[in-house]
């Protein structure tokens, strides 16, 4: 096809008219100091607090200190090759992480990048790591249970959907084990889980991931990892990243559970960053805003009402509430719960589960101290049958502790006191539970019913565990319909009580303990 000169001229004019110059205006600065992962930048005039700053080599830093003549930023990743004079740019973006169902079953780092070798993640979009928590009007009261699978917790310290329940104790008292069992117990509950590992050994995290996979819970879980060898900035931000991933489900009318393991290490990482940024230290050398560090994170765990979900999804989801339940973990030193970070988190959360070294070493596992453990809002969410049956359990254990201490000094005890001690020691034995063996609502109900109605009275102490195992096996085979009904409805009425009693009477009559 031949073009004459006029056509060529017109074509060139048309192209010139359609040509658009896309100019990108970005503020550029120069690094003036580098030390311990902190960079000072001169020349960034309009940078935001928390903004991502682009460094050479596809890396980013986060602006934390905005000063008169410079900006203090923390590098997310390796910083050995950064030096004075290196040019950096603002991005105009706050840190965002990928969110969506594609993250379920995956292990990711703080930035949401996969580290499990399973290829790229198919995410549904991005969400800022720092989000303002839902307001008072957008929330709904906690009235649905989260079953942990532990008798001691579900009976005495119940947790509801949207609650923040602290797990606190010294090292090696079973804190992580309790949280992992709670995640394993959500396999069939529809609750999506997020496990955030902060400042732990990579081998420990690999073991947790392997256990979740073995028990079929990994497909329902997102694992966010910031190991002890990673930069303090990544350890500090990991809980916020995990929270953003959990909020994806909450805001769409679903239920999610997030475990922060643990927030003590996050506070230490934040303290390190703050001291390097030359912020004034306070109590235990923590900065003044360490309370806000945890409060703004834990306030995001909530149960939101139908209107919030409908507004967020623009009418795509109606008539559904969403929830994000948080299980933060705090490690104490020598049982000192009055230290700075433990007292902060205790005051923020809706209750706490105390795990004690002495109980753990004596063989009582989970090592829950029922005397000082409490759930401030979970009672309203407790399953009906467990709530009705477990009323006497806490009382029996509290009285047993008191009488056990007293009986050490008294040689002659009356029959009533002796009976209370016998009952208490058997209930304590019944509360023991193996790791990775969460129990269903019906199994817990049968065990607690046996304790409450005196069926453990003639059982030898060392045979209580065998008695429970045999009883549950018998009830599952002989009263399968009842077990199914309790698991599905959680109801408790005269008919269910009568059938439980008949089943236990028959079981006890055919067994010798």
Swiss-Prot record:
EC number from the UniProt entry: 7.1.2.2
InterPro entries: ATP_synth_asu-like_sf (IPR023366), ATP_synth_asu_C (IPR000793), ATP_synth_asu_C_sf (IPR038376), ATP_synth_F1_a_nt-bd_dom (IPR033732), ATP_synth_F1_asu (IPR005294), ATPase_a/bsu_AS (IPR020003), ATPase_F1/V1/A1_a/bsu_N (IPR004100), ATPase_F1/V1/A1_a/bsu_N_sf (IPR036121)
UniProt-listed Gene3D superfamilies: 2.40.30.20, ATP synthase alpha/beta chain, C-terminal domain, P-loop containing nucleotide triphosphate hydrolases
A Gene Ontology term for the protein's cellular component: plasma membrane
GO terms (BP aspect): proton motive force-driven ATP synthesis
Principal place of residence: membrane
Molecular functions per Gene Ontology: ADP binding; ATP binding; proton-transporting ATP synthase activity, rotational mechanism
Catalysed transformations (reactions): ATP + H2O + 4 H(+)(in) = ADP + phosphate + 5 H(+)(out)
Short name of one Pfam family: ATP-synt_ab_C
Sequence positions that bind ATP: 169-176
Annotated positions for site Required for activity: 373
Subcellular location: Cell inner membrane
UniProt-listed SUPFAM superfamilies: C-terminal domain of alpha and beta subunits of F1 ATP synthase, N-terminal domain of alpha and beta subunits of F1 ATP synthase, P-loop containing nucleoside triphosphate hydrolases
Superkingdom to which the source organism belongs: Bacteria
UniProt xrefs under NCBIfam families: atpA (TIGR00962), PRK13343.1 (NF009884)
Similarity-based family: Belongs to the ATPase alpha/beta chains family.
Function: Produces ATP from ADP in the presence of a proton gradient across the membrane. The alpha chain is a regulatory subunit.
Summary of subunit composition and partner proteins: F-type ATPases have 2 components, CF(1) - the catalytic core - and CF(0) - the membrane proton channel. CF(1) has five subunits: alpha(3), beta(3), gamma(1), delta(1), epsilon(1). CF(0) has three main subunits: a(1), b(2) and c(9-12). The alpha and beta chains form an alternating ring which encloses part of the gamma chain. CF(1) is attached to CF(0) by a central stalk formed by the gamma and epsilon chains, while a peripheral stalk is formed by the delta and b chains.
PANTHER family for the chain: ATP SYNTHASE SUBUNIT ALPHA, MITOCHONDRIAL
Protein name listed in UniProt: ATP synthase subunit alpha
Gene (name only): atpA
């Amino acid at each position: 096809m031949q073009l004459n000169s006029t056509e060529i001229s017109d074509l060139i004019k048309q192209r010139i008219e359609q040509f658009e110059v896309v100019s990108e205006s970005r503020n550029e600065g120069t690094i003036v100091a580098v030390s311990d992962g902190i960079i000072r930048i001169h020349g960034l005039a309009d940078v935001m607090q928390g903004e991502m700053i682009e460094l050479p080599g596809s890396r980013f830093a986060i602006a934390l200190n905005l000063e008169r003549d410079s900006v203090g930023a923390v590098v997310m990743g390796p910083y050995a090759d950064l030096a004075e004079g290196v040019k950096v740019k603002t991005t105009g973006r706050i840190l965002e992480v990928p969110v969506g169902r594609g993250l379920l079953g995956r292990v990711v780092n703080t930035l949401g990048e996969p580290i499990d070798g399973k290829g790229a993640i198919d995410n549904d979009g991005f969400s800022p790591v720092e989000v303002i928590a839902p307001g008072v009007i957008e929330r709904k009261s906690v009235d649905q249970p989260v079953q942990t699978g532990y008798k001691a917790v579900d009976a005495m310290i119940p947790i509801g959907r949207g609650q923040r329940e602290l797990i606190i104790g010294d090292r090696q008292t079973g804190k992580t084990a309790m949280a992992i069992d709670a995640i394993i117990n959500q396999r069939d509950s529809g609750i999506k889980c997020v496990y955030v590992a902060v400042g732990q050994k990579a081998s420990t995290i690999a073991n947790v991931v392997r256990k979740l996979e073995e028990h079929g819970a990994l497909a329902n879980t997102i694992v966010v990892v910031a190991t002890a060898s990673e930069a303090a900035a990544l350890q500090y931000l990991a809980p916020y990243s995990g929270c953003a991933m959990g909020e994806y489900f909450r805001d769409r009318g679903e239920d999610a559970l997030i475990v922060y393991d643990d927030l003590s290490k996050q506070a230490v990482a934040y303290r390190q960053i703050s001291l390097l940024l030359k912020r004034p230290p306070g109590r235990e050398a923590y900065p003044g805003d360490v309370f806000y560090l945890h409060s703004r994170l834990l306030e995001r765990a909530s149960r939101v009402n139908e209107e919030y979900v409908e507004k967020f999804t623009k009418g795509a989801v109606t008539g559904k509430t969403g929830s994000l339940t948080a299980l933060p973990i705090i490690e104490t030193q020598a049982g000192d719960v009055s230290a700075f970070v433990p007292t902060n988190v205790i005051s923020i959360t809706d209750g706490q589960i105390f795990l004690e070294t002495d109980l753990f070493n004596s063989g009582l596992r989970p090592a829950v101290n029922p005397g000082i453990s409490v759930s401030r809002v979970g009672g309203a969410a407790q399953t009906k049958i467990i709530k009705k049956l477990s009323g006497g359990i806490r009382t029996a254990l509290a009285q047993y502790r008191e009488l056990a201490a007293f009986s050490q000094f008294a040689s002659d005890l009356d029959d009533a006191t002796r009976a209370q001690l016998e009952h208490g020691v058997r209930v304590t034995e019944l509360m023991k539970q193996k790791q990775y063996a969460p129990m269903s609502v019906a199994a817990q109900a049968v065990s607690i019913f046996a304790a409450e109605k005196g069926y453990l009275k003639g059982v030898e102490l060392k045979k209580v565990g065998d008695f429970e195992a045999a009883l549950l096996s018998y009830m599952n085979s002989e009263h399968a319909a009842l077990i199914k009904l309790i698991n599905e409805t959680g109801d408790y009425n005269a008919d269910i009580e009568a059938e439980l009693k008949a089943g236990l009477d028959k079981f006890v009559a055919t067994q010798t303990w």
